[in-house]
Amino acid sequence: MIREAIYEIVNRNNLTIDKTKEVMNRIMDGGATDAQIASFLTSLRLKGETIEEITACAMVMREKCQKLNPEFDVLDIVGTGGDELATFNISTISSFIIAAAGVPVAKHGNRSVSSKCGSADLLEVLGVNIMLTPQQCEAILKKVGMCFLMAQTFHSSMKYVAKVRKELGIRTIFNILGPLANPAKASYELIGVYDENLVEPIASVLVNLGVKRAMVVHGHDGLDEITLSDTTTICEVNRGRLNSFFITPEQFGLKRCSLSELIGGTPQENREIALNILNGEQGAKRDTVVLNSAVCLYMFYDNMTLKQCLRMAQDMIDSKKALNKLDEFIKASHET
């Protein structure tokens, strides 16, 4: 079955959703050889993954993972990684601001991919216990209004592809599946992608997956976040409808910066950056976090404008509510 699928892909034929799900199920159940997995991933990459193929793979990952079942809508803010720019942890720091503003956040993440410090690495040096069971994560989400979902804890089937992915050393469909496979089935998502050509296709996949509202973003400087150093392309998902547009920092009264001002470092260095921002330090890093947070608040709160959400995000920092949310989260991660 996998051999037939590889044959079709090599001949530049697209797979149906059902056929792709069959192949993905076989891989995620450990029923494919390393050679078959490598051939499937490489040929798919060379052909170019379709919206249907990405949708099918994301569906299987969602089915196979350990799940959270919150009684309320949650938001995720996450990037694909792979932009190779080594920026600081914009989405992770934003999550404390968003949660402090009353939006439940189920942050899905892992250790470093494209930088020296992934979301898990930063949270760990901040003092968060990241190795929690799904039951503990669900309890913390209910108690604190946010949780961290460690990818390796929730997606155990990924062990069947880990060795092949590492040996291949190229981007594959799995680089974009992580943000699409939140174990809490986030209804609201801000997803950053490393390639502008992925913006609208990923938005279409989110429609297929039933997400209520989402923003898929790509900075023209290459960033898989909303950037302050250039224009950002956005495709908005709003209950099945798509709307693509561009934003610039100047539209929101923010000063454009150089990309070098957004570069991060080691986990310890990024810890210092995070605490400086949450303690009120001004500058490009703060403004970038504020803008990404504001877009998430805008998605969740239908009755607010983006500029109002920008002021709310700024207030979450200046009032120390975001810093207090971090402290609350750290404490809960060790007590639950």
UniProtKB/Swiss-Prot annotation:
Tell me yes or no: is Amino-acid biosynthesis among this UniProt entry's keywords.
Answer: yes
The protein's matches in InterPro entries, at most eight in alphabetical order, are given as: Anthranilate_Pribosyl_Tfrase (IPR005940), Glycosyl_Trfase_fam3 (IPR000312), Glycosyl_Trfase_fam3_N_dom (IPR017459), Glycosyl_Trfase_fam3_N_dom_sf (IPR036320), Nuc_phospho_transferase (IPR035902)
Q: Which of this chain's residues are annotated to bind anthranilate 1? A: G79, N110
Keyword Magnesium in record: yes
| Sorted UniProt keywords | Amino-acid biosynthesis, Aromatic amino acid biosynthesis, Glycosyltransferase, Magnesium, Metal-binding, Transferase, Tryptophan biosynthesis
Biological process (GO) annotations held by this record are: L-tryptophan biosynthetic process
One Gene Ontology CC term in the entry: cytosol
Q: What GO molecular functions are on record for this protein?
A: anthranilate phosphoribosyltransferase activity; magnesium ion binding
Reported EC number(s) for this entry are 2.4.2.18
Annotated 5-phospho-alpha-D-ribose 1-diphosphate binding sites: 79, 82-83, 87, 89-92, 107-115, 119
Where Mg(2+) 1 binds, per the record, is at S91, E225
Return the broad EC class: transferase
Note the subunit structure: Homodimer.
Tell me the NCBIfam families matching this sequence. trpD
Q: Which family is it part of?
A: Belongs to the anthranilate phosphoribosyltransferase family.
The record's function comment reads:
Catalyzes the transfer of the phosphoribosyl group of 5-phosphorylribose-1-pyrophosphate (PRPP) to anthranilate to yield N-(5'-phosphoribosyl)-anthranilate (PRA).
What protein name is recorded for this chain?
Anthranilate phosphoribosyltransferase
**Per UniProt, what is the name of the gene that codes for the protein in this document?**
trpD
